[in-house]
Design a protein with these regions (language model features):
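Short beta-strands and strand-loop turn motifs
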Residues: 88-90, 156-160, 187-192
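Active-site beta->alpha N-cap acidic-glycine motif
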Residues: 5-97, 103, 110, 114, ...
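His/Asp/Glu-enriched short active-site or ligand-binding loop at hydrolase and phosphoryl-transfer sites
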Residues: 140-180, 215-222
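Divalent metal-coordination and catalytic microenvironments
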Residues: 38, 53, 62, 86, ...
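Alpha-helical scaffolding segments of alpha/beta enzyme cores, especially the outer helices
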Residues: 48-51, 74-81, 106, 110-113, ...
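Domain-start "cap" segments at the beginnings of catalytic or binding domains
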Residues: 112-113, 117-156
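Catalytic grooves of carbohydrate-active enzymes
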Residues: 182-195, 199-222
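Short histidine/acidic/glycine/proline-rich micro-motifs that form metal-
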Residues: 66-69, 92-95, 140, 161-164, ...
């Protein structure tokens, strides 16, 4: 039986051209993959991700929801202590299309503040700074929000979307669709969320093993 893969796994160049200031893919010809995880930290999913990454000495970028950082400071600390990059995914994960420019910028500001405060409160976090990386929830921004934010943050979207949040897909399909679309420097979106976890726990080990066996490295965006 033929596998049915989701559409739009690979971001078309025509879409990238609409927002040239966005980081879609890292500029490298080396065999390096940039795994990113949205919507954490949450206890079970994020802890699983950290354990899997450690097996392969892999680094990644975690786009954190500010409210989840507030709820789970211990998990956030584990992410930082493991040497991963933490970045802004707004305070409450609301689509930019649903908020005014002012309200959306406040969502971003609140998340940035809690990231900075959480890092400063850590015993070894005094020298760590929260990054100025930002990923909009759902990848959705109004033009006015985009114009404002690109002056203060490096907006990061993706080259490959895993669709691990899709309840109709299996973890195997998620892994295979990522593997078929990755190239050097690809930024891949996965989710350390409760919703995505049933697929993530199948897909992530397969992705890590596949690329590690072929000599790839896994790096964070800095």
């Amino acid at each position: 039986m033929n596998k049915v893969f989701p559409l739009w796994v690979k971001t078309p160049r025509s879409i990238r051209a609409l927002m040239p200031d966005v980081l879609w893919q890292m500029p490298t010809k080396d065999k390096v993959l940039y795994l990113t995880f949205d919507d954490g930290p949450v206890p079970e999913a994020t802890s699983f991700v950290l354990a899997q990454l450690e097996k392969y000495n892999a680094k990644a970028t975690f786009f954190c929801i500010g409210d989840n950082v507030r709820k789970h400071p211990d998990i956030f600390q584990q992410v930082v202590n493991a040497g991963h990059t933490v970045a802004n995914h707004t305070m409450h994960h609301i689509s930019g299309w649903e908020l005014s420019e002012e309200a959306y910028l406040e969502e971003v500001k609140l998340c940035q503040e809690i990231l900075s405060q959480s890092l400063a409160a850590m015993a070894n976090g005094g020298t760590k700074k929260s990054t100025k990386l930002f990923r909009p929830p759902y990848g959705k921004l109004k033009p006015s929000q985009y114009r404002k934010l690109k002056n203060s943050y490096q907006i990061v979207l993706w080259d490959v979307l895993s669709y691990d949040f899709d309840l109709n897909l299996s973890g195997e399909i998620v892994a295979d669709s990522v593997i078929q679309n990755v190239e050097q420097g690809s930024i891949v979106v996965l989710h350390d969320s409760v919703k995505a976890f049933p697929r993530l726990q199948v897909a992530l080990p397969k992705i890590l093993q596949y690329y590690a066996e072929r000599g790839w490295k896994f790096a964070s965006i800095v």
